[in-house]
Amino acid sequence: MHSEELLAQVAALPALPGVYRYFDSQGLLLYVGKARHLKRRVASYFTKNHGGTRIGHMVCKIARLETTVVRSEAEALLLENNLIKTQNPRFNILFRDDKSYPYLKITGAPASSAGRDAPGQRFPRIAYYRGAVDKQHRYFGPYPSAWAVKESIELLQKVFRLRTCEDTVFANRTRPCLLYQIKRCSGPCVNLIAPEAYAVDVQHAQALLSGQTQELLQAMEARMMAYSGQLAFEQAAEVRNQMQALSRVLHQQSIESAHDKDVDILAVRVQGGRACVNLAMVRGGRHLGDRPYFPTHLEDAALFEQETRDAEEAPATPPRPVEALVLEAFVAQHYMVVAPPPVLVTSTPLDKALLEALSGHLTAAQGGDHAPAAQGGDPPPAASSGGHPLRGTVHITAVHQPREQRRAWLEMAQKNADLQLARLLAQEGSQQARTRALAEALDLPLADLDPLTIECFDISHTAGEATQASCVVFHHHKMQSSEYRRYKIDGITGGDDYAAMRQVLTRRYGKLAEAAHEAGGVDCAARPAAPAQGQARLPDLVLIDGGKGQVGVAREVFTALGLDLTRIVGVEKGEGRKVGLEELVFADGREKASLGKDSAALMLVAQIRDEAHRFAITGMRAARARVRTGGGQLQEIAGVGPKKRARLLQRFGGVRGVASASVEDLITVDGISRALAEEIYRALR
C-alpha cells in the first residue's frame, strides 16, 4: 500500500504538461516519464490494477514522487530524456555509450599561420583526436570509429601531403622522414615547401573534408592553368598530380554523394527482447561507416509505455511499435550531446514534435559564444564535417521513405543492424550458457542466474615496485567495468603477494562484513537473498588469481571477518602454465577440480581471470610510470591534471626538464597560463 501522503500528492497534481519521477524507499530512481496532463497520467499508475506484471511490481515499490511542470509537451520530452541519460532509471530505455566520438583535427588556423613564429604553427598538422577542444584548432567529424578517422588522414596524406608528426618531432628534424620519401608528406620540417604553398594545401584539405569536392577540383584546375600560363610547368605538374590523386581517391570511394554532404542514417531492429540502432554517418558526401547502439531496459520501458499511454490517448489510437519508442529515445538522448546533421534518414517515422523540440533546444543552446560541451569528453558538437560549431537556427528534417542513394544507405544500415543484433543475441546466449555451466560445476543456485555476481582479484607489480591490486566484477552475464576497482597497496614488503592479497580483501570486504554484523544478527556465512537495487552485497563467488597460498590468505581473511568460505575459489595454473589446464582450488577443504580444456565453465573463469590481470597490470604500469617520471609530483600541483602533466612531460622530456624550464618556456605549452606556469616554477624549485 502507498502512503496517504503520496496519494494526496498525486491528487493535487496540476493538469499541465511536465515530467514525473518515481523513487523507491531507498531513494533510487525507478522511472522517469513525461505527460501532457500530469494529474491524469500519474494517477493512472495508482488507480489501475496492474496485477502481477512487472509494472505492478514497480508500482508497489514507489515511495516518493517528484514532478517538474514545463511549458509544453516538447519541453517535457527533452527534460525526460536528459534525466534518463544522466540518472539511469531502472525502467526506462537507456542508451549507454562509454566511448566518445573521434574527430580529425587540423592544428592552428590557416588564415593566421603566416604570422606565427613557431615552425610547427606555421605548418599545421592533421591528427586523430578525442577529448576537449581548443579554439585555435579545427575539428572535423564526428566519425563513427577510429578507423574512419585514420582512413581520412591517409587520404589527406596521399593527396595533399600534410604532416602528421608531433611539434616536438617537427622542430628537431634535420632531414625529411620516411613519409616524405614515400610521397605522403611535403617535408615542411626542413623547408622543402613554402608556408604559403602549404597553407593552400591545408585549405584544400578543409574543402575536401567539408564535401566541396567539385569546387575543389575546379579551383585546382584553375591553379594549374595559371601556373601553366606563367610557364611554371613544374608547379603545374604538381597540381596536376594532386588532381589525379584526388580523382583516384574519389573514384575508389564506393559510396559517395554530390548532393548530401552531411546525413545520419538510423536503422532500428528489435528481436528477442533486444534492440539495435545502427547509426551510419555521411560527412562531406563520404560514407564514413556505422556504429551500433544497444539500449538497456527495453522490455520494461516498452510495457510501461503501452500500459500507461492509455491515460492520455484516445481509445482508438493504435499503439506505437517498439521500434518507434527505441528510435525516439535514441534521437532524444544522442543528439542532446552530439549535434545532428541537417537530415536524418530513418527506418521508422519520427515524431515531428520531437524534431521541433530538439531543433529549438539546440538553437537556444548554441545561441551564445560557446557551444555546450558534449558528454564523455567529446568536443563541442559540430554541425557538419566543416568543423564549425552550430550557430544560429538549427533545423532538423527526417526522411522515412528515402529514394535513390539515401535508400541504398538505409538498406545497408538495416542489414548491418540485423547483423549486429544477431551477433549480440548469439554472444549473450553463449555467455549465459557459460554462466550456467559454471554454476552447475560449483553447485551454485540455478533458479535465477542473472544476479549471480563474481568478483576476481589479481596483484601486479614490477619487482615489488608500484604494487596494485585489481577487483573486476561480473554479473548479469557480462563484465561490469563501471564497478571495477583498483587498490594501491602500501605498507608491505615489496613483492609480498600474500600480504597484498590480504590487504585488498580486507579493504574490500571488511566494512561490508562489519555492516552486516551490525544489522542485527545477520549470518554472514549464509548466502544472502538478492538485495535491493543499488544495495551493497557480498558476491556469490570470489575468484583469486593464484593457487594454494593465495587461497590460504583469502581463507584467513574470510574467517576473521566471519564470511562464507565456500565463496572463495582460486584459479591455479596447470602443468607448464598451459592455457586450458587450470585447476580450481577451494578454501573450504574440497579437492581441487579440473573443469576440462573445452569446458564452458572454464572459459568463463579464464575470461574473468584475464580481465582482472589486464586491469591490474595497466594500473601498475601507469603507477610505475608516474613514479619513474615524477609525474605524480607534477599532478600534486593545483591546476595540473593528467592532460597538462602529459603535455609538460612530452615538451620537456621529464620532470627534470620541467623543473629547469623558465616561466616563459612553460607558458608555451597548451593550457598553461602564466599564473599556472609561475605556480609550477615555484613548486618544482
Curated annotation (Swiss-Prot):
GIY-YIG domain ranges (all copies): 15-93
Pfam (any one): GIY-YIG
GO terms for cellular component: cytoplasm; excinuclease repair complex
Superkingdom field: Bacteria
Keywords, alphabetical: Cytoplasm, DNA damage, DNA excision, DNA repair, Excision nuclease, SOS response
Gene3D superfamilies: 5' to 3' exonuclease, C-terminal subdomain, GIY-YIG endonuclease, UVR domain, UvrC, RNAse H endonuclease domain
Residues covered by the UVR domain: 214-249
Main location: cytoplasm
Biased composition (Low complexity): 365-388
Region (Disordered): 365-391
SUPFAM superfamilies associated with the record: C-terminal UvrC-binding domain of UvrB, GIY-YIG endonuclease, RuvA domain 2-like
GO MF term (any one): excinuclease ABC activity
Key word DNA damage present: yes
GO biological process terms, semicolon-separated: nucleotide-excision repair; SOS response
Protein location: Cytoplasm
Function: The UvrABC repair system catalyzes the recognition and processing of DNA lesions. UvrC both incises the 5' and 3' sides of the lesion. The N-terminal half is responsible for the 3' incision and the C-terminal half is responsible for the 5' incision.
Family: Belongs to the UvrC family.
Subunit structure: Interacts with UvrB in an incision complex.
Stated name of the protein: UvrABC system protein C
Organism encoding this protein: Verminephrobacter eiseniae (strain EF01-2)
Source species taxonomy: Bacteria, Pseudomonadati, Pseudomonadota, Betaproteobacteria, Burkholderiales
Gene this chain is encoded by: uvrC
